[in-house]
Design a protein with these regions (language model features):
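AMP-forming adenylation/ATP pyrophosphatase catalytic core
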Residues: 2-46, 58, 66, 72, ...
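Core alpha/beta nucleotide-donor-binding catalytic domains of modification enzymes
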Residues: 2-221
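Hydrophobic/aromatic-lined pockets within catalytic cores
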Residues: 151, 228, 287, 291
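Mid-to-C-terminal catalytic subdomains of enzymes
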Residues: 193-243, 247, 326, 332
Length: 335
Protein backbone atom coordinates (compact mmCIF):
# COMPACT_ATOMS: atom_id res chain seq x y z
CA UNK A 1 0.00 0.00 0.00
CA UNK A 2 1.38 3.40 -1.03
CA UNK A 3 1.19 6.20 1.54
CA UNK A 4 -1.02 9.23 0.97
CA UNK A 5 0.26 12.74 0.34
CA UNK A 6 1.11 14.38 3.67
CA UNK A 7 0.76 18.16 3.43
CA UNK A 8 1.82 18.65 7.04
CA UNK A 9 5.05 16.76 6.38
CA UNK A 10 5.82 18.92 3.34
CA UNK A 11 5.25 22.07 5.42
CA UNK A 12 7.57 20.71 8.12
CA UNK A 13 10.21 20.00 5.47
CA UNK A 14 9.96 23.59 4.22
CA UNK A 15 10.45 24.95 7.73
CA UNK A 16 13.22 22.64 8.88
CA UNK A 17 16.51 24.53 9.51
CA UNK A 18 18.52 22.11 7.36
CA UNK A 19 16.40 22.96 4.31
CA UNK A 20 18.13 26.34 4.17
CA UNK A 21 21.50 24.56 4.53
CA UNK A 22 20.67 22.33 1.56
CA UNK A 23 19.62 25.39 -0.44
CA UNK A 24 22.97 27.03 0.29
CA UNK A 25 24.74 23.84 -0.75
CA UNK A 26 22.88 23.86 -4.06
CA UNK A 27 23.79 27.51 -4.61
CA UNK A 28 27.48 26.85 -3.88
CA UNK A 29 27.37 24.06 -6.45
CA UNK A 30 25.83 26.30 -9.10
CA UNK A 31 22.34 24.73 -9.23
CA UNK A 32 20.07 27.53 -10.50
CA UNK A 33 16.60 28.34 -9.19
CA UNK A 34 13.93 26.18 -10.77
CA UNK A 35 16.37 23.51 -11.97
CA UNK A 36 15.07 19.96 -12.19
CA UNK A 37 17.20 17.71 -10.00
CA UNK A 38 17.08 14.06 -9.00
CA UNK A 39 17.98 12.89 -5.51
CA UNK A 40 19.80 9.55 -5.50
CA UNK A 41 18.01 7.79 -2.65
CA UNK A 42 19.07 4.49 -1.11
CA UNK A 43 16.53 4.35 1.70
CA UNK A 44 19.19 5.19 4.29
CA UNK A 45 18.88 8.09 6.71
CA UNK A 46 21.23 10.42 4.81
CA UNK A 47 19.52 10.28 1.42
CA UNK A 48 16.05 10.13 3.01
CA UNK A 49 16.79 13.38 4.84
CA UNK A 50 18.07 14.99 1.63
CA UNK A 51 14.99 13.78 -0.21
CA UNK A 52 12.64 15.28 2.40
CA UNK A 53 14.51 18.58 2.68
CA UNK A 54 14.59 18.93 -1.11
CA UNK A 55 10.84 18.30 -1.17
CA UNK A 56 10.53 21.32 1.12
CA UNK A 57 12.62 23.39 -1.31
CA UNK A 58 10.56 22.15 -4.24
CA UNK A 59 7.38 23.23 -2.46
CA UNK A 60 8.37 26.88 -2.81
CA UNK A 61 9.94 26.61 -6.26
CA UNK A 62 13.67 26.52 -5.50
CA UNK A 63 13.96 23.27 -7.50
CA UNK A 64 11.86 20.73 -9.37
CA UNK A 65 12.37 17.38 -7.68
CA UNK A 66 12.44 13.77 -8.82
CA UNK A 67 13.87 10.85 -6.85
CA UNK A 68 15.78 7.91 -8.29
CA UNK A 69 16.47 4.68 -6.42
CA UNK A 70 18.35 1.58 -7.54
CA UNK A 71 17.72 -1.98 -6.38
CA UNK A 72 21.20 -3.43 -6.78
CA UNK A 73 20.05 -6.91 -5.75
CA UNK A 74 23.23 -7.61 -3.77
CA UNK A 75 21.44 -7.73 -0.42
CA UNK A 76 18.12 -9.52 0.01
CA UNK A 77 16.73 -6.39 1.67
CA UNK A 78 17.46 -4.07 -1.27
CA UNK A 79 13.93 -4.34 -2.67
CA UNK A 80 12.58 -3.24 0.72
CA UNK A 81 14.98 -0.28 0.66
CA UNK A 82 13.47 0.85 -2.65
CA UNK A 83 9.96 0.33 -1.29
CA UNK A 84 10.81 2.56 1.67
CA UNK A 85 11.96 5.29 -0.73
CA UNK A 86 8.70 4.96 -2.68
CA UNK A 87 6.64 5.25 0.51
CA UNK A 88 8.42 8.41 1.63
CA UNK A 89 8.18 9.82 -1.89
CA UNK A 90 4.42 9.28 -1.89
CA UNK A 91 4.06 11.15 1.42
CA UNK A 92 6.10 14.00 -0.05
CA UNK A 93 4.29 14.02 -3.38
CA UNK A 94 7.55 13.42 -5.23
CA UNK A 95 7.88 11.16 -8.31
CA UNK A 96 10.12 8.16 -7.59
CA UNK A 97 11.83 6.23 -10.39
CA UNK A 98 13.26 2.77 -9.71
CA UNK A 99 15.74 0.58 -11.55
CA UNK A 100 16.71 -2.99 -10.71
CA UNK A 101 20.21 -4.23 -11.52
CA UNK A 102 21.04 -7.78 -12.53
CA UNK A 103 24.64 -8.26 -11.43
CA UNK A 104 26.47 -11.55 -11.59
CA UNK A 105 28.46 -12.58 -8.53
CA UNK A 106 32.23 -12.78 -8.66
CA UNK A 107 35.28 -10.60 -8.27
CA UNK A 108 34.94 -6.83 -8.29
CA UNK A 109 31.25 -6.94 -7.42
CA UNK A 110 31.34 -3.75 -5.34
CA UNK A 111 33.03 -1.75 -8.10
CA UNK A 112 30.72 -3.18 -10.76
CA UNK A 113 27.69 -2.37 -8.62
CA UNK A 114 28.87 1.21 -8.09
CA UNK A 115 29.38 1.73 -11.82
CA UNK A 116 26.04 0.14 -12.69
CA UNK A 117 24.28 2.28 -10.07
CA UNK A 118 25.66 5.49 -11.54
CA UNK A 119 24.65 4.34 -15.02
CA UNK A 120 21.12 3.59 -13.80
CA UNK A 121 20.88 6.94 -12.01
CA UNK A 122 22.12 8.76 -15.12
CA UNK A 123 19.59 6.94 -17.27
CA UNK A 124 16.74 7.92 -14.94
CA UNK A 125 17.94 11.53 -14.73
CA UNK A 126 18.05 11.82 -18.51
CA UNK A 127 14.62 10.19 -18.74
CA UNK A 128 13.02 12.78 -16.44
CA UNK A 129 14.97 15.79 -17.71
CA UNK A 130 17.06 16.38 -14.58
CA UNK A 131 20.29 18.31 -15.01
CA UNK A 132 21.87 17.26 -11.70
CA UNK A 133 21.91 14.16 -9.51
CA UNK A 134 22.06 15.01 -5.81
CA UNK A 135 24.01 12.71 -3.49
CA UNK A 136 23.75 12.88 0.31
CA UNK A 137 27.47 12.65 1.09
CA UNK A 138 28.06 14.62 4.28
CA UNK A 139 30.92 15.96 6.42
CA UNK A 140 31.57 12.57 8.05
CA UNK A 141 31.88 10.93 4.62
CA UNK A 142 34.16 13.77 3.60
CA UNK A 143 36.50 13.30 6.54
CA UNK A 144 36.64 9.54 5.90
CA UNK A 145 37.62 10.22 2.30
CA UNK A 146 40.24 12.80 3.29
CA UNK A 147 41.86 10.55 5.90
CA UNK A 148 42.05 7.58 3.53
CA UNK A 149 43.53 9.84 0.83
CA UNK A 150 46.06 11.22 3.32
CA UNK A 151 47.10 7.70 4.34
CA UNK A 152 47.55 6.71 0.70
CA UNK A 153 49.58 9.80 -0.21
CA UNK A 154 46.99 11.06 -2.65
CA UNK A 155 48.33 14.61 -2.85
CA UNK A 156 46.60 17.92 -2.20
CA UNK A 157 43.73 17.16 -4.56
CA UNK A 158 42.98 13.86 -2.86
CA UNK A 159 43.26 15.40 0.59
CA UNK A 160 40.60 17.89 -0.46
CA UNK A 161 38.10 15.06 -0.47
CA UNK A 162 34.95 15.03 -2.59
CA UNK A 163 34.08 18.13 -4.63
CA UNK A 164 30.68 19.74 -4.25
CA UNK A 165 30.02 19.11 -7.93
CA UNK A 166 31.57 17.00 -10.66
CA UNK A 167 30.56 15.24 -13.88
CA UNK A 168 28.63 12.04 -13.24
CA UNK A 169 31.18 9.16 -13.33
CA UNK A 170 29.67 6.95 -16.02
CA UNK A 171 29.56 6.51 -19.78
CA UNK A 172 25.79 6.45 -20.32
CA UNK A 173 25.04 8.26 -23.63
CA UNK A 174 24.10 11.86 -22.85
CA UNK A 175 25.46 11.72 -19.30
CA UNK A 176 28.34 14.06 -20.13
CA UNK A 177 25.91 16.92 -19.48
CA UNK A 178 24.87 15.63 -16.05
CA UNK A 179 26.40 16.82 -12.79
CA UNK A 180 26.77 14.93 -9.53
CA UNK A 181 26.08 17.51 -6.79
CA UNK A 182 26.75 17.08 -3.06
CA UNK A 183 24.87 19.81 -1.16
CA UNK A 184 25.33 18.25 2.31
CA UNK A 185 29.13 18.27 2.63
CA UNK A 186 29.00 20.81 5.46
CA UNK A 187 26.40 18.81 7.41
CA UNK A 188 27.07 15.97 9.82
CA UNK A 189 25.71 12.44 9.67
CA UNK A 190 24.08 13.08 13.02
CA UNK A 191 22.26 16.20 11.81
CA UNK A 192 20.80 14.42 8.77
CA UNK A 193 19.63 11.50 10.89
CA UNK A 194 18.19 14.04 13.31
CA UNK A 195 16.22 15.63 10.47
CA UNK A 196 14.59 12.26 9.72
CA UNK A 197 13.59 11.97 13.37
CA UNK A 198 12.31 15.56 13.49
CA UNK A 199 10.20 15.05 10.38
CA UNK A 200 8.98 11.57 11.25
CA UNK A 201 10.13 9.96 8.01
CA UNK A 202 11.14 6.32 7.92
CA UNK A 203 14.53 5.10 6.76
CA UNK A 204 16.32 1.79 6.40
CA UNK A 205 19.57 0.66 8.02
CA UNK A 206 22.27 -0.89 5.85
CA UNK A 207 24.17 -3.38 8.05
CA UNK A 208 27.25 -3.12 5.83
CA UNK A 209 27.77 0.40 7.22
CA UNK A 210 28.62 -1.19 10.58
CA UNK A 211 31.50 -3.26 9.21
CA UNK A 212 34.90 -2.69 10.76
CA UNK A 213 36.95 -4.93 8.48
CA UNK A 214 37.37 -2.43 5.63
CA UNK A 215 39.58 0.69 5.46
CA UNK A 216 36.54 2.99 5.43
CA UNK A 217 34.86 1.04 8.23
CA UNK A 218 37.94 1.32 10.44
CA UNK A 219 38.20 5.06 9.77
CA UNK A 220 34.47 5.54 10.42
CA UNK A 221 34.17 3.55 13.64
CA UNK A 222 37.64 3.85 15.17
CA UNK A 223 39.67 6.76 13.80
CA UNK A 224 37.04 9.51 13.56
CA UNK A 225 35.54 8.88 17.03
CA UNK A 226 39.09 9.11 18.41
CA UNK A 227 39.63 12.41 16.59
CA UNK A 228 36.35 13.79 17.90
CA UNK A 229 37.36 12.81 21.44
CA UNK A 230 40.54 14.86 21.03
CA UNK A 231 38.95 17.82 19.22
CA UNK A 232 35.17 18.05 19.30
CA UNK A 233 33.87 19.29 15.96
CA UNK A 234 36.78 17.86 13.99
CA UNK A 235 34.43 16.49 11.34
CA UNK A 236 32.81 19.84 10.61
CA UNK A 237 36.11 21.74 10.56
CA UNK A 238 37.75 19.13 8.33
CA UNK A 239 35.02 19.63 5.73
CA UNK A 240 35.95 23.32 5.47
CA UNK A 241 39.65 22.44 5.37
CA UNK A 242 38.90 20.10 2.47
CA UNK A 243 37.33 22.98 0.57
CA UNK A 244 40.46 25.07 1.09
CA UNK A 245 42.67 22.18 -0.05
CA UNK A 246 40.65 21.77 -3.24
CA UNK A 247 40.84 25.51 -3.96
CA UNK A 248 44.59 25.46 -3.39
CA UNK A 249 44.94 22.49 -5.69
CA UNK A 250 42.93 24.24 -8.40
CA UNK A 251 45.31 27.21 -8.24
CA UNK A 252 48.39 24.97 -8.44
CA UNK A 253 46.97 22.90 -11.29
CA UNK A 254 45.99 26.00 -13.27
CA UNK A 255 49.55 27.29 -12.88
CA UNK A 256 51.03 23.99 -14.05
CA UNK A 257 48.58 23.79 -16.99
CA UNK A 258 49.75 27.22 -18.15
CA UNK A 259 53.36 25.96 -18.06
CA UNK A 260 52.77 22.99 -20.37
CA UNK A 261 53.91 23.21 -23.97
CA UNK A 262 51.97 22.04 -27.06
CA UNK A 263 53.49 18.56 -26.68
CA UNK A 264 52.53 18.35 -23.00
CA UNK A 265 56.07 18.80 -21.71
CA UNK A 266 57.13 21.42 -19.15
CA UNK A 267 60.35 23.43 -19.26
CA UNK A 268 62.39 22.89 -16.10
CA UNK A 269 63.28 26.57 -16.12
CA UNK A 270 59.66 27.26 -15.14
CA UNK A 271 60.39 25.70 -11.75
CA UNK A 272 63.40 27.88 -11.01
CA UNK A 273 62.95 29.47 -7.58
CA UNK A 274 59.47 27.92 -7.39
CA UNK A 275 58.29 25.99 -4.31
CA UNK A 276 58.56 22.21 -4.46
CA UNK A 277 54.76 22.08 -4.19
CA UNK A 278 54.58 23.26 -7.80
CA UNK A 279 56.89 20.48 -8.98
CA UNK A 280 54.93 17.94 -6.94
CA UNK A 281 51.69 19.14 -8.53
CA UNK A 282 53.25 18.81 -11.98
CA UNK A 283 54.20 15.21 -11.23
CA UNK A 284 50.69 14.44 -9.94
CA UNK A 285 49.15 15.91 -13.11
CA UNK A 286 51.56 14.25 -15.54
CA UNK A 287 51.60 10.83 -13.89
CA UNK A 288 47.95 10.90 -12.74
CA UNK A 289 47.37 7.71 -10.74
CA UNK A 290 50.08 5.70 -12.52
CA UNK A 291 52.95 6.27 -10.09
CA UNK A 292 53.48 5.24 -6.47
CA UNK A 293 53.90 7.86 -3.75
CA UNK A 294 57.64 7.44 -3.14
CA UNK A 295 58.42 7.70 -6.86
CA UNK A 296 56.26 10.84 -7.18
CA UNK A 297 58.28 12.64 -4.53
CA UNK A 298 61.60 11.47 -5.98
CA UNK A 299 60.53 12.85 -9.36
CA UNK A 300 59.44 16.16 -7.81
CA UNK A 301 62.80 16.53 -6.08
CA UNK A 302 64.62 15.75 -9.33
CA UNK A 303 62.74 18.51 -11.15
CA UNK A 304 64.01 21.22 -8.81
CA UNK A 305 67.46 19.90 -7.82
CA UNK A 306 69.34 21.67 -10.63
CA UNK A 307 71.02 18.53 -11.96
CA UNK A 308 71.19 18.18 -15.76
CA UNK A 309 71.55 14.40 -15.57
CA UNK A 310 68.61 12.71 -17.34
CA UNK A 311 66.48 10.57 -15.02
CA UNK A 312 63.47 8.37 -15.62
CA UNK A 313 60.76 7.43 -13.16
CA UNK A 314 58.58 4.38 -13.87
CA UNK A 315 54.82 4.55 -14.24
CA UNK A 316 52.31 1.72 -14.47
CA UNK A 317 51.67 0.41 -17.96
CA UNK A 318 55.28 0.81 -19.03
CA UNK A 319 55.27 4.60 -19.40
CA UNK A 320 57.78 6.75 -17.55
CA UNK A 321 58.22 10.31 -16.40
CA UNK A 322 61.40 11.71 -17.92
CA UNK A 323 63.28 14.55 -16.19
CA UNK A 324 65.89 15.80 -18.67
CA UNK A 325 68.25 18.76 -18.55
CA UNK A 326 65.67 21.20 -19.88
CA UNK A 327 62.25 19.53 -19.77
CA UNK A 328 59.86 17.19 -17.98
CA UNK A 329 57.63 14.90 -20.00
CA UNK A 330 55.84 11.56 -20.02
CA UNK A 331 57.31 9.00 -22.38
CA UNK A 332 54.81 6.34 -23.50
CA UNK A 333 55.54 2.66 -23.21
CA UNK A 334 57.54 1.21 -26.08
CA UNK A 335 56.19 -1.85 -27.85
Amino acid sequence: MIAALDERLILACRRHPLAAEVARGLTRSGVPDGARVMVAASGGADSTALMALCAGLAAHGRIELVVGTVDHGIRSESALDCHCVAMVGARLGVPVLTRRLDLSSGSGLADRARTARYEALASMALECGATSILAAHHADDQLETMLIALARGAGLGGMGGMPGRRPIPCETPGSQHLLLVRPCLRMSRESLRGACVDLGVQWREDPTNDRRDTPRGIVRHVVIPALESVATGATRRAARTGELARLGNVLLESHVSAMRGPDGSIARSAFQNAPEALAATAVWMLAEDRMDDATRWSAAEAIVDGSTEPRRFPMSGGSELSVCAHSVRVRPATV
